[in-house]
Each structure stands twice: as structure tokens, then as C-alpha cells.
């Protein structure tokens, strides 16, 4: 079950799997010399399982629950070691938003103010409909801003990686913090420019 990684925890077993395992052990004790015909054996196990009461199955259900706890615990211990490189660094540059996300950030407060008590799901639905109804030209300012932020993000990542190698995490954290402030200032300036453009359109 742990193909390619011997340290990976053994998969969790179902109640039926424990039942089959028990049947196999019983068969070995009673007929140690007789090899198991798996096709026939599986069929018999399946038929027997179907005729068992919930009370009879309870023992195997408990075994499956205990094995699930074991599996979850082992996977929790195994996960960080395997995915350690993928662990999020709080000092890393923040991933840039998409054009749609920028549009949502602008119009979400407006929808909430005009529709008091509206659910989060309905807000998302309305935003999706509004975005889909925009022409490519109307989407352009948001997509352009997203492209700029993406470009900046890629530069920040390159700086962050090089800083992390030479100056350590502390230097990277300082750099990331400074970049974040600059990015927020830039966003505010662009927001003001867009609002001015909107006013001109009106």
C-alpha cells in the first residue's frame, strides 16, 4: 500500500476488511495445509457478511474505528515530514489576487450595503453574475491591475528566495514586510486612479 515510500502509513481498513482478515486466520487455524482459493473464499465471506446482524458486525466496526484513529494519527505525523518543503512560510510574498478577486473586493461592500442580511453565498453568486455580464473592455482594468500585481509578486518571490539563501529568514521577513507596505501604497494609488476614471465615465 505504501508504494514508493516505505514510511507512508498503512491504509485504514474497513469493518468488512477486518472480517475477511479474521475469516482467513480462522481458515488457517482449521486447515493449515489447505491453500486458500481467494475467489471462492471472498464469495463465501461476502455471503456470510450479508447475513450477519448489526450486533455481530459491531466488533468489526469498532476495529475499523480504532484503525481509522491509528491511520489519522500516523498520517498527521507523516504529513509534515513529507510536505515540509510545501509548508507555508509566513514571511513569503503574498500570492496576488486575480482580476475577478479585485472586482469582488470593490463591489462586495456595495452589495452588502444595498442588501442588508444577504448571505455570503448569495453575495458570491451576485458577484459572479455581475462579472460574467461585464464586457472584456470593462474587465480590462481589473485584469491589468492583476497582471501588474502578478509581475510584482514574481519579482518579490525572486528577491525573497535570494535573500532567504544569503541573509536568512530575518532578512527575508524585513524585505517581505517592506514590499507589502509598498504594494499596499501602490494599490491605494491605483484605486484612486480607477475611481477618477469611473467619475469621468459618469
Swiss-Prot record:
Region ranges (Disordered): 71-98, 161-202
DNA-binding region: 9-79, 93-161
Cellular localisation: Nucleus; Chromosome; Cytoplasm
GO BP term (any one): innate immune response
Entry GO terms, CC: chromosome; cytoplasm; nucleus
Sequence ranges of Acidic residues compositional bias: 183-202
Cysteine pairings via disulfide bonds: 23-45
The keyword Secreted is annotated on this UniProt entry: no
A Pfam match: HMG_box_2
CDD domains documented for this protein: HMG-box_HMGB_rpt1 (cd21978), HMG-box_HMGB_rpt2 (cd21979)
Post-translational modification comment from the UniProt entry: Reduction/oxidation of cysteine residues Cys-23, Cys-45 and Cys-104 and a possible intramolecular disulfide bond involving Cys-23 and Cys-45 give rise to different redox forms with specific functional activities in various cellular compartments: 1- fully reduced HMGB3 (HMGB3C23hC45hC104h), 2- disulfide HMGB3 (HMGB3C23-C45C104h) and 3- sulfonyl HMGB3 (HMGB3C23soC45soC104so).
Principal location listed in the UniProt entry: nucleus
PANTHER family: HIGH MOBILITY GROUP PROTEIN B3, HIGH MOBILITY GROUP PROTEIN DSP1
UniProt similarity note: Belongs to the HMGB family.
Role: Multifunctional protein with various roles in different cellular compartments. May act in a redox sensitive manner. Associates with chromatin and binds DNA with a preference for non-canonical DNA structures such as single-stranded DNA. Can bend DNA and enhance DNA flexibility by looping thus providing a mechanism to promote activities on various gene promoters. Binds to the delta-1 crystallin/ASL1 enhancer. Proposed to be involved in the innate immune response to nucleic acids by acting as a cytoplasmic promiscuous immunogenic DNA/RNA sensor.
Protein name from the UniProt record: High mobility group protein B3
Amino acid at each position: 500500500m505504501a508504494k514508493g515510500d516505505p514510511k507512508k502509513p498503512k491504509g485504514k481498513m474497513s469493518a468488512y476488511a477486518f472480517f475477511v482478515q479474521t475469516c482467513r486466520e480462522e481458515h488457517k487455524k482449521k486447515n493449515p495445509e489447505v491453500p486458500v482459493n481467494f475467489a471462492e473464499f471472498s464469495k463465501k465471506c461476502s455471503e456470510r457478511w450479508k447475513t450477519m446482524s448489526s450486533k455481530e458486525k459491531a466488533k468489526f466496526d469498532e476495529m475499523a474505528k480504532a484503525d481509522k484513529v491509528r491511520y489519522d494519527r500516523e498520517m498527521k505525523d507523516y504529513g509534515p515530514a513529507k510536505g515540509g518543503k510545501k509548508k507555508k512560510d509566513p514571511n513569503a510574498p503574498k500570492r496576488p489576487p486575480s482580476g475577478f478577486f479585485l472586482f469582488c473586493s470593490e463591489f462586495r461592500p456595495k452589495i452588502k450595503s444595498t442588501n442588508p442580511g444577504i448571505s455570503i453565498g448569495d453575495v458570491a453568486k451576485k458577484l459572479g453574475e455581475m462579472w460574467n455580464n461585464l464586457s472584456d473592455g470593462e474587465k480590462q482594468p481589473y485584469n491589468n491591475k492583476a497582471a501588474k500585481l502578478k509581475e510584482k509578486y514574481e519579482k518579490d518571490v525572486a528577491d525573497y528566495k535570494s535573500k532567504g539563501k544569503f541573509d536568512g529568514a530575518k532578512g527575508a521577513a524585513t524585505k517581505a514586510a517592506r514590499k507589502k507596505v509598498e504594494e499596499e501604497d501602490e494599490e491605494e494609488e491605483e484605486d484612486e486612479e480607477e475611481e477618477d476614471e469611473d467619475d469621468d465615465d459618469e
